[in-house]
Amino acid sequence: MSIRLLCCVAFSLLWAGPVTAGITQAPTSQILAAGRSMTLRCTQDMRHNAMYWYRQDLGLGLRLIHYSNTAGTTGKGEVPDGYSVSRANTDDFPLTLASAVPSQTSVYFCASSD
């Protein structure tokens, strides 16, 4: 790939403009020492009733951690141990790791649906 082509691609991305995400996770990446706690935030602006937290480990498909069918209610998924959630309102569904362990190293996904 020539330098000129690479510059054009970068320039095109700069002019792409903002995109409405609908659902946002934060932080986007995190390195955490064993034994430390942290909260992954998930926010959606689509007024969906249901929200979900999944994890994907190397070589495996998505596995459900916790879910919420409506604000004020939560349920456990396939791999809930070591995690807690809350759902005080329709828009937010934070996932907390109380005391991180190496087996929780994963890619985490938040989702929502009607």
UniProtKB/Swiss-Prot annotation:
GO terms for biological process: adaptive immune response; cell surface receptor signaling pathway. SUPFAM superfamilies: Immunoglobulin (SSF48726). The keyword Membrane applies. Disulfide bonds join C42-C110. Residues 22-114 form the Ig-like domain. The keyword Isomerase does not apply. It is found in: Cell membrane. Pfam families: V-set. SMART domains: IGv. Residues 1-21 form the signal peptide. Its main location: membrane. Alpha-beta TR is a heterodimer composed of an alpha and beta chain; disulfide-linked. The alpha-beta TR is associated with the transmembrane signaling CD3 coreceptor proteins to form the TR-CD3 (TcR or TCR). The assembly of alpha-beta TR heterodimers with CD3 occurs in the endoplasmic reticulum where a single alpha-beta TR heterodimer associates with one CD3D-CD3E heterodimer, one CD3G-CD3E heterodimer and one CD247 homodimer forming a stable octameric structure. CD3D-CD3E and CD3G-CD3E heterodimers preferentially associate with TR alpha and TR beta chains, respectively. V region of the variable domain of T cell receptor (TR) beta chain that participates in the antigen recognition. Alpha-beta T cell receptors are antigen specific receptors which are essential to the immune response and are present on the cell surface of T lymphocytes. Recognize peptide-major histocompatibility (MH) (pMH) complexes that are displayed by antigen presenting cells (APC), a prerequisite for efficient T cell adaptive immunity against pathogens. This is T cell receptor beta variable 6-4.
